[in-house]
Each structure stands twice: as structure tokens, then as C-alpha cells.
Amino acid sequence: MRLSGNGLRCVRGGREVFSGLDVAAESGHAVAITGPNGAGKTSLLRLLAGLLAIADGSISLEGGDPELTLPEQAHYLGHRDALKPALTVSENLSFWRDFLGGGKSGESDALAAVGLDHVAHLPAAYLSAGQRRRLSIARLLAVKRPVWLLDEPTSALDVTGQAAFAAIMTGHLAGGGIILAATHTPLGIAARELRIGGAA
């Protein structure tokens, strides 16, 4: 499987964020997208996820499911945790599993993998910032998709949480997955760097 973007141009609010940008990643490989604030790291991920319109260029996924679009084969994990405070940990994960079209199995395993199985009954409002991030990460495991597009995925995670997530990412890559992550800090896994320039 190969994900590629060629000659990408992004315009937001009438301002050109970047142009002529090429990006590529193959099965079993990760790309760390780096650069100053405002350079377009998040915008690139959102283009790949189909959440922003491409001003110019092309995006393709070779070797994926031909009956599904790239967004249908990708997880986009934004820098904000999309959780409902009144719902329990388990209910939040169930919501995302249903929304993303996942099966009924795997939820308990996903919570255990991120260390939240013991608080599955608690409302998300009671979680710490790190626990909220781990719950967001559980979505990646509850619904299997080959491409992970991650925006500052280790934000709010402590050292233990970062190590656990590195192991999760390593497992995803070992299974033939692809990871592109916008980050200011090391991911804890082998990754090729794609640096985007631009003013902060």
C-alpha cells in the first residue's frame, strides 16, 4: 500500500498555506511531519483526510480497498479530543465505533490497550487530559483502518503513556499500516521526517 500526495496546494481563508508539496508513505512506514507553527502540518493532514479541499495537486492510495475512498480507510486523530463529557468512557468509544462503521467487538481490548479498562464506567468529564488523549487513541484500535493521520498524538501523555502509544504505533506498522503524524516532539518510533517550512 502506498499513500501519496503530489504538488499539493492548500489555501485557507484566502491565504496560501503551502504549495508544490509532495508527501508519500508506504505500508509499514511512518512519516513525522515537522515545522514551525502555522507552516501547515495540520492542514496537510486534513487534506489527506478529506476534511479540506485541495487547491491544486492530487492524492492517491494505491493498494487499498478499491471500493473505499481514502478517508474511509483512514483515521484522523486531531489535536483536540472529540469526546462527550456526559458519556462514559465506554459510551464514548462505542459512539465512535458506530460512527466509523466498526464491528461490535474489540472495544474492551482497545480500552485495555490504552489502560482505561478500569475506568470504562466513568463519565469522560472525570478523565485527566492524558486519559482523554488515551481514549481518543483507543478509537484507532476499536475500528481497524490502515492509514493513521495523527495531529500531535502524544500531547498530554506522560512518559508511560508515550511509551505505550509507541508500542501501539509499532504494532500498527508491523501489520502493514501507514502513519503520518504532525509533531513537535519525537514519536518514539522510526519515522522519516517531512519538514514543512513557512512563517510561524
From Swiss-Prot:
Gene Ontology, cellular component aspect: plasma membrane
Residue intervals of the ABC transporter domain: 1-200
PROSITE patterns: ABC_TRANSPORTER_1, ABC_TRANSPORTER_2, CCMA
Subcellular localization, as worded in the UniProt entry: Cell inner membrane
Stored SMART domains: AAA (SM00382)
Domain of life, source organism: Bacteria
Keywords attached to this entry: ATP-binding, Cell inner membrane, Cell membrane, Cytochrome c-type biogenesis, Membrane, Nucleotide-binding, Translocase, Transport
Coiled-coil region list: none
Membrane topology of the entry: Peripheral membrane protein
Principal location listed in the UniProt entry: membrane
EC numbers for this chain: 7.6.2.5
GO molecular function annotations of the record: ABC-type heme transporter activity; ATP binding; ATP hydrolysis activity
Catalysed reaction equations from the record: heme b(in) + ATP + H2O = heme b(out) + ADP + phosphate + H(+)
One GO term (biological process): cytochrome complex assembly
Binding-site list for ATP: 35-42
UniProt similarity note: Belongs to the ABC transporter superfamily. CcmA exporter (TC 3.A.1.107) family.
Function (record text): Part of the ABC transporter complex CcmAB involved in the biogenesis of c-type cytochromes; once thought to export heme, this seems not to be the case, but its exact role is uncertain. Responsible for energy coupling to the transport system.
PANTHER family the record matches: ABC TRANSPORTER I FAMILY MEMBER 1
Subunit structure: The complex is composed of two ATP-binding proteins (CcmA) and two transmembrane proteins (CcmB).
Protein name (record): Cytochrome c biogenesis ATP-binding export protein CcmA
Upper classification of the organism: Bacteria, Pseudomonadati, Pseudomonadota, Alphaproteobacteria, Hyphomicrobiales
